[in-house]
């Protein structure tokens, strides 16, 4: 018979809590957690009890959050602690495990024995062994140490913090660069990149190792193969320094790798951000992406993608529209105006959307303005002004409205989506 658990406080008291197993027959049996097994912070059953300097026992996760918030006192006694060290309370932990096992004949799940958190000394030792193995070119030993870091990171957030704070990031970057020209080191490089994603931000020395030609070549190879960690790491590197962007654009086949990457859900957003950084650098990069049909692919993304993807795609289109060649490509896509009009009030970040529409309409032959007007853009843009937007966006919206107003007067066009009953409060009409 299946058994589920519900937790409730008795009479609103914070000192007592009940666990109520509910059987499929709706029979309830109440079990009160002994007060000595409850964490004084959360009043929940302790899974990893530790003693602090005041002599009070807490659940490790809760007391660590307390210390990380800047407190250096005992939550119960309010005394200032001379040390923030946490010592496992094995006696209480064994008592809790025994109580869990005996309650309801084992109906309450027994808490597992917690792993001892890694120490700074242990992390330093792992880093030293990884550095030595890297210098020797010992693939197996490097794989062992990187895998050990991965395992430590999976065990707890505290472990991740300890690994990061004890120099692992630089050692991993050096290892990646050292094996980047080894065609048989793919597994090691994948694992290294995976760990590096929670080592950010990477220092200047580490960045210099990850942005060498050989390192970038391997990161692009991982990206091409669908590695989402590589997509994330590349994006982070490009956001740190424009020189990394210039270095990446020189890598053979990088544009093709990103075009492949934006078609995968797991790597799409990070890859769009990276493309945005790349096309900001020079005309040659923009031209290459245009040859690879970036405009049509990003426009298609706007049709039914999530808002986060749409916003990044619009950012890319906005930069593309800075060039004459790019604007022409965007204008020739028949979906552009309908999609832009449809999305005006549907996405939260509208700056790039308005900018793309403004650039397309301003550089077009007037047909784009007429189409936008016919699809109801006028009313939506007025609503944008009503709600409020940034000064630069407001100027573009106002200019778009002037263009549309001019077309309406010249052609006797009536925007049938425009309702005279709408109250345009707080909107000055310069159009």
Swiss-Prot record:
Any idea where the U-box domain is? 32-106
Q: Which key words tag this protein in UniProt?
A: Transferase, Ubl conjugation pathway
Q: Name one Pfam family in it.
A: U-box
State the Gene Ontology BP annotations: protein ubiquitination
Name the chemical reaction catalysed here: S-ubiquitinyl-[E2 ubiquitin-conjugating enzyme]-L-cysteine + [acceptor protein]-L-lysine = [E2 ubiquitin-conjugating enzyme]-L-cysteine + N(6)-ubiquitinyl-[acceptor protein]-L-lysine
Q: Please give the InterPro entries that the UniProt record associates with this protein.
A: ARM-like (IPR011989), ARM-type_fold (IPR016024), PUB22/23/24-like (IPR045185), RING-Ubox_PUB (IPR045210), Ubox_domain (IPR003613), Znf_RING/FYVE/PHD (IPR013083)
One GO MF term on file is: ubiquitin protein ligase activity
Question: Which EC numbers does the record give?
Answer: 2.3.2.27
Pathway assignment:
Protein modification; protein ubiquitination
Functional description taken from the UniProt entry: Functions as an E3 ubiquitin ligase.
Q: What is this protein called?
A: U-box domain-containing protein 20
What species does this protein belong to? Arabidopsis thaliana (Mouse-ear cress)
């Amino acid at each position: 018979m299946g058994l589920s658990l519900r937790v409730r406080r008795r009479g609103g008291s914070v000192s007592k809590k009940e666990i109520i197993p509910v059987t499929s027959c709706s029979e309830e049996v109440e079990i009160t957690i002994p007060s000595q097994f409850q964490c004084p912070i959360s009043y929940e059953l302790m899974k990893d009890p530790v003693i602090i300097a005041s002599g009070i026992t807490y659940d490790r996760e809760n007391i660590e959050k307390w210390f990380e918030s800047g407190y250096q006192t005992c939550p119960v006694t309010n005394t200032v602690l001379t040390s923030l060290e946490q010592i496992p309370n094995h006696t209480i932990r064994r008592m809790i495990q025994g109580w869990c096992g005996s309650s309801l004949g084992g109906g309450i799940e027994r808490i597992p024995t917690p792993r001892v958190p890694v120490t700074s000394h242990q992390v330093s030792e792992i880093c030293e062994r990884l550095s030595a193995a890297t210098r020797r070119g010992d693939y197996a030993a490097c794989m062992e140490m990187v895998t050990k870091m991965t395992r430590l990171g999976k065990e707890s957030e505290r472990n991740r913090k300890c690994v990061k704070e004890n120099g692992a990031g630089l050692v991993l970057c050096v290892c990646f660069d050292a094996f980047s020209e080894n065609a048989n080191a793919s597994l090691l490089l994948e694992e290294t990149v995976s760990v590096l994603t929670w080592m950010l931000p990477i220092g200047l020395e580490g960045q210099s190792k990850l942005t060498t030609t050989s390192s970038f070549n391997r990161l692009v190879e991982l990206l091409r193969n669908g590695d989402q960690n590589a997509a994330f790491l590349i994006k982070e590197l490009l956001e740190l320094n424009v020189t990394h962007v210039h270095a990446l654009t020189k890598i053979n086949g990088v544009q093709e790798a990103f075009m492949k990457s934006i078609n995968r859900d797991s790597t799409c957003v990070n890859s769009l951000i990276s493309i945005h950084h790349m096309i900001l650098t020079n005309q040659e990069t923009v031209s290459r992406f245009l040859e690879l049909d970036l405009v049509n692919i990003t426009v298609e993304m706007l049709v039914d993608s999530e808002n986060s993807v749409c916003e990044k795609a619009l950012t890319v289109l906005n930069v593309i529209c800075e060039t004459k060649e790019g604007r022409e490509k965007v204008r020739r896509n028949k979906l552009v105006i309908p999609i832009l009009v449809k999305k005006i009030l549907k996405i939260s970040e509208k700056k790039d959307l308005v900018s793309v529409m403004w650039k397309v309409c301003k550089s077009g032959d007037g047909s784009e303005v007429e189409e936008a007007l016919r699809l109801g853009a006028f009313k939506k843009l007025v609503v944008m002004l009503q709600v409020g937007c940034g000064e630069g966006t407001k100027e573009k919206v106002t200019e778009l409205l002037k263009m549309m107003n001019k077309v309406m007067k010249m052609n006797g066009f009536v925007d049938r989506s425009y309702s005279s009953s709408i109250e345009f409060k707080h909107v000055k009409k310069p159009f």
